[in-house]
């Protein structure tokens, strides 16, 4: 009886533990953020019915022979973060990071896209969520970097929505843009992690949960 229980534990552990995905440079890592005002506002405006709702995306790279993520973050702008640090910023599902790795179906031009992304290192984070202002937010970094060999952007920009599902404007956005002295760019072209994660050009290669 004790032997049967032991075998059952082994099989349950094997079945319930999600392995770390095998990552390639250029894979896009999408994560659901931990609870914060900004994460809540992004998810409310861009989330889909299915879980998790992604609020951040970064680019997997190998930097100084270590696994890392090239990302645009409110703290530090466009920077390189250790992969573990990136995953630690995720919400948890079953105690594991709520993060998914996705890969381009067509990788033509990917090396040039990565070089382009590295060229943005040091730019400030784009709290205004507007294009062509010398700043970048997370999915904007991917949008600007990932291009086809003939220079076209791989991912489309769509009219941005900052409103919650009930049509209300979250206080986070109202207060943020009041501090910036800018109008909320509702309806202006832009990107977000949730839309990008559902782009048919990408396929899932693994998840941590």
Where are these regions (language model features)?
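Bacterial N-terminal signal peptides
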Residues: 5-14
């Amino acid at each position: 009886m004790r032997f049967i229980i032991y075998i059952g534990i082994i099989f349950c552990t094997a079945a319930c533990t999600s392995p770390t995905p095998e990552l390639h440079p250029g894979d896009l890592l999408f994560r659901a953020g931990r609870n914060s005002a900004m994460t809540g506002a992004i998810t409310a405006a861009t989330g889909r019915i299915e879980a998790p709702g992604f609020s951040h995306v970064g680019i997997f790279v190998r930097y100084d022979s270590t696994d890392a993520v090239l990302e645009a973050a409110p703290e530090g702008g466009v920077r390189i973060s250790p992969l573990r640090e990136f995953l630690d910023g995720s919400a948890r599902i079953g105690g594991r990071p709520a993060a998914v790795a996705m890969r381009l179906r067509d990788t033509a031009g990917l090396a040039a896209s990565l070089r382009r992304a590295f060229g943005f290192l040091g730019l400030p984070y784009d709290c205004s969520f507007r294009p062509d202002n010398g700043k970048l937010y997370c999915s904007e970094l991917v949008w600007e970097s990932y291009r086809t060999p003939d220079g076209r952007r791989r991912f489309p920009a769509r009219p941005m929505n900052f409103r919650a599902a009930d049509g209300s404007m979250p206080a986070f956005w109202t207060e943020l843009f009041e501090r910036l002295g800018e109008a909320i760019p509702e309806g202006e072209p832009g990107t977000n992690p949730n839309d990008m994660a559902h782009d048919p050009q990408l396929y899932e290669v693994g998840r941590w949960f």
